[in-house]
């Protein structure tokens, strides 16, 4: 049986590491991912956390085992019966460094050879150090680490856990969010509610930065001058256009994606605690990874949904157009479940509004889940 060792500190485990493991498994019958432990080195994650993180993200590869080691790699490889050590190489600096380590290994006379696997071009910038720095500054991590690791970084380095709140329009997402924040505050927990509708309103009405003025100009150019000017976009007039035409709604979502994500990062800032990200279009806009696939889908009766929307001043026709322009509850749930399966990480909660004391039981279930990660 051909076997190899892939050593590293994996602090944290990245998509680059995962790629090297998957490619090694195509060559060897057995891949031993070996997590090094050096008493003189300071790690972000404990040895146990690193082992569990890797095991969770390689469980789809049957040829892989995950173990820890200390001391000389050459000795560990020798006692493991492996003649080949795999090293991932991203650039010339990596190559020179790994060549030096290989030469040092040869002096230990264990007959161990080094096989270098060059990173894919789209992963050549990925490193554990870069992932940690990006996390500390609130940047996008989806292309650096698996979602489970992204969540581990956010909770460990930033003290943050992001929970998405979504559902059809008029189902009571804000009602749930406000009630949840109230319950959490009673227990003395820190929680922040970010309403994506309010962020969008701020971008379309108030932001004076040049990039947002240019965005409003682009929206006017796309949807017509009748919806406002470069200073203010009339959301109702814009809504009459996009909620009657799904391609137009998708176009608007695409235009707003980066501005919204930028404002989300600004809103989150250095806040420590649970962050509720409330938006009807979390699924449609591709925001599930921001929440690490941790989502509360808010549900209610159709009668209550219509009542809530009529209270906002919408006509029956406007209500039907808005409902029909968005994914229904069952479809949202299906797509969230598919995303959880795809990324191997996430948690789906279903919350039914306006059911009296049962609401507190549902909230308590979500609260206990949050406590496992933050408190």
Q: Each predicted region: which residue ranges?
A:
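Nucleotidyltransferase catalytic core that binds NTPs
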Residues: 1-160, 300
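Short gly/ser/thr-rich secondary-structure transition/capping motifs
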Residues: 14, 66-68, 275-280, 325
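Well-ordered beta-strand positions
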Residues: 30, 84, 133, 192, ...
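ATP-dependent small-molecule kinase phosphotransfer cores
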Residues: 198-272
């Amino acid at each position: 049986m051909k076997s190899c060792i892939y050593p590293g500190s994996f602090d944290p485990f990245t998509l680059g590491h995962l790629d090297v493991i998957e490619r090694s498994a195509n060559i060897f019958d057995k891949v031993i991912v070996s997590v090094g432990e050096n008493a003189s080195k300071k790690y972000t994650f404990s040895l146990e956390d690193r082992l569990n993180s890797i095991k969770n993200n390689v469980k789809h590869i049957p040829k892989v085992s995950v173990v820890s080691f200390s001391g000389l790699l050459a000795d560990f490889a020798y006692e493991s019966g492996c003649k080949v050590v795999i090293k991932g190489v991203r650039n010339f600096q990596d190559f020179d460094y790994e060549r030096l380590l290989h030469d040092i290994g040869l002096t230990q006379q264990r007959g161990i050879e080094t096989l270098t696997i060059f990173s894919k071009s789209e992963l050549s910038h990925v490193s554990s150090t870069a992932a940690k720095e990006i996390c500390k500054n609130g940047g996008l991590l989806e292309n650096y680490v698996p979602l489970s690791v992204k969540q581990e970084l956010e909770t460990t380095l930033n003290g943050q856990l992001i929970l998405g709140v979504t559902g059809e329009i008029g189902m009571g997402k804000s009602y749930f969010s406000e009630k949840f924040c109230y319950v959490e505050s009673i227990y003395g927990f820190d929680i922040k509610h970010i309403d994506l509708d309010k962020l969008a309103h701020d971008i379309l009405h108030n932001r004076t930065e040049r990039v947002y003025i240019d965005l409003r100009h682009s929206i006017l150019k796309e949807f017509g001058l009748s919806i406002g000017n470069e200073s203010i976009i009339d959301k109702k007039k814009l809504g009459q256009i996009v909620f009657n035409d799904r391609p137009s709604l998708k176009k608007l979502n695409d235009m707003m994606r980066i501005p919204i994500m930028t404002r989300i990062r600004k809103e989150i800032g250095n806040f420590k605690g649970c962050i509720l990200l409330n938006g009807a279009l979390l699924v449609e806009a591709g925001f599930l990874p921001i929440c690490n696939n941790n989502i509360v889908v808010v549900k209610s009766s159709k009668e209550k949904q219509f009542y809530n929307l009529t209270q906002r001043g919408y006509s029956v026709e406007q209500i039907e157009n808005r409902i029909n322009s968005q994914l229904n509850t069952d479809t949202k749930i299906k797509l969230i479940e598919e995303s959880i399966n795809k990324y191997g990480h996430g948690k789906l909660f279903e919350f039914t509004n306006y059911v009296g004391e049962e609401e507190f039981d549902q909230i308590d279930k979500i609260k206990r889940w949050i406590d496992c990660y933050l408190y």
